[in-house]
């Protein structure tokens, strides 16, 4: 039996990329998934995000693996959408064993060209977002006296990159 058998994983930024890959990997190991993603275009940055169609496809793929998947469209910056998703997860699964804070953005700009709005969006999603989600999940983990929190980040935290002023 896998260490993840019958665990419930709440994953932000789950619609594509690392979030999607993690959701599928955990489902293959026996975990049920709460897939949380903004599932729409946001104001910054200028690249694509997960879509509601991608969330639906992820749900189908997780269920094809014999696991349950709750999809929740929401923004990690919005306490109400996070609270609603956590409440739905608890109502559906009764617990959250794993929190994978994966949602994040990157603003491609040099410091002299980055706008305040780009900076604020990046800080709010990459720093405040994990705080908001963790704050809403932790009470359930504390009640269960069990839980794992993983905060994902970028290799850019270890070394700089071209046009990455953060």
What are the residue ranges of the model-derived segments?
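Residue(s) in the substrate-gating loop at a strand-loop-helix junction
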Residues: 154
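Substrate-binding pocket helix/loop in short-chain dehydrogenase/reductase
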Residues: 110-111, 118-123
